[in-house]
From Swiss-Prot:
Enzyme class at the top of the EC tree: hydrolase
Active site: E142
InterPro entries linked to this entry: Peptide_deformylase, Peptide_deformylase_sf
Keyword Kinase: no
Protein name as catalogued: Peptide deformylase 1
Source organism of the structure: Xanthomonas campestris pv. campestris (strain ATCC 33913 / DSM 3586 / NCPPB 528 / LMG 568 / P 25)
Enzyme Commission number: 3.5.1.88
A Pfam family the protein falls into: Pep_deformylase
Known function: Removes the formyl group from the N-terminal Met of newly synthesized proteins. Requires at least a dipeptide for an efficient rate of reaction. N-terminal L-methionine is a prerequisite for activity but the enzyme has broad specificity at other positions.
HAMAP family: Pep_deformylase
Note describing how the cofactor binds: Binds 1 Fe(2+) ion.
Keywords: Hydrolase, Iron, Metal-binding, Protein biosynthesis
Length: 171
């Protein structure tokens, strides 16, 4: 079922989400299916549970090819609960970001270039991966949603922030 994506200004996006406690449950599997369906319908590359007004540390992400980010390499489709992120270097990388909760806008955001992330699949299987580049960016962006943060709070140069159909800033 496609869920409504709440937008910036809704205070539910600013809360720290509690951990998932029902790993392996039918309810969690149904929620994950809804999240993937919602993400795909919105042509997104990731979605966090708080974006559909579900207060849980849960994210989905991944794609073979993205209409919104055509230059981005494929990212494995993943559902991840109770996420932890560790930067593997101090190296930061600037890149364009948008958000399904902030439709039509984009900005250049600095993110760690290489990270290790861990958590649990919906069935309770542990997941631990290293990611770099766009894959790392997507995971960090979705993680921000789990801790009540939206990408505009990370903007360093507001000349890069604007509507997708108007922006002309080059990286």
């Amino acid at each position: 079922m496609i869920r409504e994506i709440i937008r910036m200004g809704d205070k539910r996006l600013l809360r720290v989400a509690p951990p998932v406690t029902n790993l392996g449950s039918d309810e969690l599997h149904a929620l994950v299916a809804d999240m993937f369906e919602t993400m795909d319908a919105a042509r997104g590359v990731g979605l966090a549970a708080p974006q559909i007004a579900v207060d849980l540390q849960l994210m989905v992400f991944g794609f073979e090819a993205s209409e919104r980010y055509p230059e981005a390499p494929a990212v494995p489709r993943t559902a991840l609960a109770n996420v932890q992120i560790e930067p593997l270097s101090d190296e930061m990388e600037n890149g364009w970001e948008g958000c399904l909760s902030i439709p039509g806008l984009r900005a250049v955001i600095p993110r760690h270039r290489v990270i290790r992330y861990s958590g649990f699949a919906p069935d309770g299987t542990p997941i631990e991966r290293e990611a770099e580049g766009f894959h790392a960016r997507v995971v960090q962006h979705e993680y921000d949603h789990l801790v009540g943060r939206l990408y505009p709070s990370r903007i360093e140069n507001f000349d890069t922030f604007g509507f997708e159909d108007v922006l002309s800033y080059d990286l």
